[in-house]
A protein has these predicted regions:
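...captures the hydrophobic TM-helix bundle architecture rather than a specific catalytic motif
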Residues: 1-449
Length: 449
């Protein structure tokens, strides 16, 4: 175990929201409508306290790793094994006797982990704060906000757990937690047929990618006999002769899983419909967390591509990743031009920017797998640029979605104020007015701060 005090606390980063999730769900169901529960914003303040604690622990971990604890050894990884989950015997490929293997629940911290951990914890906290004002002021959400905050916390737990996982099995399990919660959050207004349909569409489309991801992990296990990052990313271990054709297939399967999660062509169809969820859900799924999971998975492949004995063996896959990113970036940006729904414009913009990052990661992987002087310097530069844009985009798009939520919120109130005096026409206007239609938003700059 290494990493000091903050590493010991790191297990609470995914654990706190996971433990708070059933508390809010059960208490909210038992005491909904009670005055004291309403004062707690139907669980919103409890959720905010949990995410605030997570943010503080995350900042401590970042500080210890980069500046305080490690100092000049800030590039060291922190591997903290909390415990073994499954232990079983199996026959190895060699003539060795039965070998015991375990999937331990632990944390793995490097620069990629820290970057995404800060983005996820910081934006989840801000979106939670925004949700208290957004969700609790709308009468349609009365007495059911506890379900929103419970699913929100479980989603955050899944994202944070995936970011800190020290092996691909736990990464996959937390990955699936996010998939379940996205279904619950997108379909929060389940009484609307469009929302229920969008939730099912998102769930089934991303499951297609997840099946490929699971196959890829099985192939990876078959090659390395382990799913631990510390083993797979060990260049001395990777340098041992491996079946490059099988490895190529395994990494391709994993990339398809990332394509589904990050809404890239051709598994992009779920993202625009996911706007049926409340605006905080749009900010959470499409900016801060879920869509970045696919990018994180591809970035995690970097050490495999950089292994010396695999030089030139994986360039075709790197080129494919670059092409998929380029095609999706152009396609999504073109579609965004003809959208009138403010949230769909942001959704297609998100898809395009994520594709831009995929293109950068593909270039980084190509350089890492190349074999010429200075190729690793170019690979690290491309990787850093891609992750820097991921950071920028997550922050900017999270704020844009929350700003669009404020605009939509005020459009609803303005429309109601203009037409409440005419009871006869009110229903007619409500049936045809779309608060998300940008053609109704002319002159807002002079009316809103």
């Amino acid at each position: 175990m290494s990493g000091g005090f903050s590493a010991d606390l790191a297990m609470f980063i995914p654990l706190l929201p996971m433990l708070t999730f059933p508390i809010i769900l059960i208490v909210g169901q038992l005491f909904k409508g009670e005055e004291w529960w309403i004062k707690l914003k139907e669980g919103g303040l409890i959720s905010l306290a949990a995410m605030g604690s997570v943010l503080i622990i995350s900042l401590l971990l970042v500080y210890d790793y980069i500046g305080g604890l490690h100092g000049e050894h800030a590039s060291d990884n922190v591997i903290d094994k909390v415990g073994d989950w499954i232990t079983f015997d199996f026959l190895s490929n060699s003539s060795e006797p039965m070998i015991s293997k375990a999937f331990g629940l632990g944390i793995y911290v490097d620069h990629i982990t820290l970057m995404l951990l800060f983005v996820a914890s910081f934006l989840c906290f801000l979106i939670n704060w925004f949700s208290i004002g957004y969700m609790n002021t709308d009468p349609i959400n009365e007495n059911r906000n506890h379900r929103f905050y419970a699913a929100f916390l479980l989603f955050c737990s899944g994202m944070l757990g995936m970011t800190l996982a020290d092996n691909f099995l736990w990464l996959f399990m937390f990955w699936e937690v996010m998939g379940l919660c996205s279904y619950l959050l997108i379909g929060f207004y389940w009484e609307r047929p469009s929302a229920a349909s969008a939730a099912k569409k998102a769930f089934l489309t991303t499951r297609v990618g997840d099946v490929f991801l699971m196959v890829g992990l099985v192939i990876l296990w078959n090659i390395y006999g382990s799913l631990d990052f510390a083993t797979i990313f060990d260049w001395n271990y990777i340098a041992n002769p491996v079946d490059t054709g099988l490895l190529h297939i395994g990494l391709l399967m994993m990339f398809i899983g990332a394509v589904g999660k990050s809404a890239q062509f051709p598994l992009h169809v779920w993202l625009p419909d996911a706007m049926e969820g409340p605006t905080p859900v749009s900010a959470l799924i499409h900016a801060a967390t879920m869509v970045n999971a696919g990018l994180y998975l591809v970035a995690r492949m970097f050490p495999i591509f950089a292994a010396g004995d695999l030089s030139g063996e994986l360039t075709e896959l790197a080129i494919l990743i670059t092409w998929i990113g380029g095609i999706t970036a152009f396609m999504a940006a073109a579609i965004a031009f003809v959208q009138m729904d403010i949230k769909k414009v942001l959704a297609y913009s998100t898809m395009s920017q994520l594709a831009y990052i995929f293109t950068g990661l593909g270039v980084a992987l190509w350089f890492a797998n190349a074999d010429f002087e200075g190729h690793m310097a170019l690979a690290y530069f491309a990787l850093g640029a891609s992750l820097f844009h991921l950071f920028n985009h997550a922050m900017a798009k999270g704020m844009l979605f929350m700003a669009s939520g404020s605009v939509i919120h005020e459009m609803h109130h303005a429309h109601h104020h203009l037409h409440h005096h005419d009871d006869h026409d009110d229903d007619h206007h409500e049936d045809h007015f779309d608060a998300q239609d940008m053609s109704n938003m002319g002159g807002l700059a002079s009316k809103m701060p």
